[in-house]
């Protein structure tokens, strides 16, 4: 009986979805290729882009909040789906 109970507990833990983890692009290339698993509290993917020295700069990753500040020509985009910050 103990073996059956232990087996059921192990199967329950193995099959239980302990939480959804978001994935976001995390590189600075125009065509992103790499992703990262966001920490549990990170709900947004973001993409920052701006022009510096005549060259477009891009930053991507996971974020706890979605900043809507656009200043000095900097564009900030946030989204909530997996890999939506291409």
UniProtKB/Swiss-Prot annotation:
Q: Which UniProt keywords apply?
A: Disulfide bond, Secreted, Signal, Toxin
Where would you find this protein in the cell?
Secreted
**Gene3D superfamilies in the record:** CD59
Q: Is Disulfide bond one of the keywords? A: yes
Q: Name one GO cellular component term.
A: extracellular region
What domain of life does the UniProt record list for this protein's source? Eukaryota
Q: What is this protein called?
A: Candiduxin-1
Annotated source species: Bungarus candidus
